Amino acid sequence: NRFNEETLSTPAEKNSNPVNVSPKELAAIVFTSGSTGPPKGVCYMHKTFDGQISALRENFGMQEGEVDMTTLPIFALFNPALGITTVMPEIDPSKPAKASAQSLVETLVDFEVTTAFASPVIGRKIADWCEHGNLRLPRMNRFFLAGAPSPPQLVEKLASVMDNGQVLIPYGATEALPVSYCTHADVMRARKGIEQGEGSCLGKALPGVSIKLFPVSASPFGNEVEEINEGQVGEICVAGPTVTEEYYRMPGATFDSKFRYDSQIYHRMGDLGYFDVDLSLR
C-alpha cells in the first residue's frame, strides 16, 4: 500500500477543500506528439479541462465507477475527474505496433474494462485476436478509435466483438479535444463513399464547438479571412470550450495557428475537409 497511515487516517474534509482558481488560469502544459515537428507545449486552462470533462460525460455517457484502458497517458488525466479507474496496459505508447494483442485483450477481460481509447493499430490487434480466438468483450460500453483514419472494415470488426458497446471515432488534436465524433452506425452509412475516396467520416461538432472551413493558406490568418463557399474543401478550424488558446512561450506558433473570428479564438487543425450532404465533416 503506497499510502502511509497518516494519509489514511486524515479526515477526508482536510484534503477535499478545492483551491480557488480562475477558469482562465493555467492548469497544465500538455505536449503535442511531435508528428508534424518538434513537440509544442499546449496551455490547458482550468476551463479547458472543464469543457473536456463535460464533453466526455454528456456526449459519451462516461460515468463514475467505470474502468478505462487507455494507451495514451494524456487520457488518464480526465479519469480522476470522472470517477473512472485507469488501467494502463503493457505498451510503449511510442511503438503501438509492437504491442501484444494477447496482453491487450487479457487486460480488457481481467480488469473488466468498460471503456477504452486506442489508435486503429491497437484496435485492429484487439479485433483480430478476439476474432481468431472466438472471444467476446461483453463488458465494453465503448471503444474510442482515434489518432489515424479508421477503415470501415476495422470499425465493423471491432463492433462485432462487443455485445453491448459501440465503436466511437472522435476527431481532435492536443490543441482541441474533442471536436466532433461519429459512431459505428455513421461509418457504416458512409462506408461506400469512404471506400471510394470521399474522405473519412469525422461526424458533427459537439455542442458548443464551432467548426468552420477557410481557404488553404501557409500564412497566418488575419482579420480579413473569410469562410469558403458551401461544398468546397478547406482547412478545418475550430473554436469552443475544448479548444486551447496558446502554446507555452511560443508566440510565433500561437500566431500561426490561432486567429480571432466572430469574436472567438479559432485553432487551425492543419487538416483539410468538407461538409457532406448530411453536414457531417469529412
Language-model features, listed with the residues they occupy:
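Gly/Ser/Thr-rich phosphate-binding loop
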Residues: F3, I84, T115-F117, D128-G197, ...
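Short Gly/Pro-enriched turn/cap motifs at secondary-structure boundaries
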Residues: N20, E198-A205, E227, S263-Q264
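Short, flexible, glycine-rich and Lys/Arg-enriched loop motifs at helix boundaries
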Residues: M88-Q102, D163, M188-G197, A218-E226
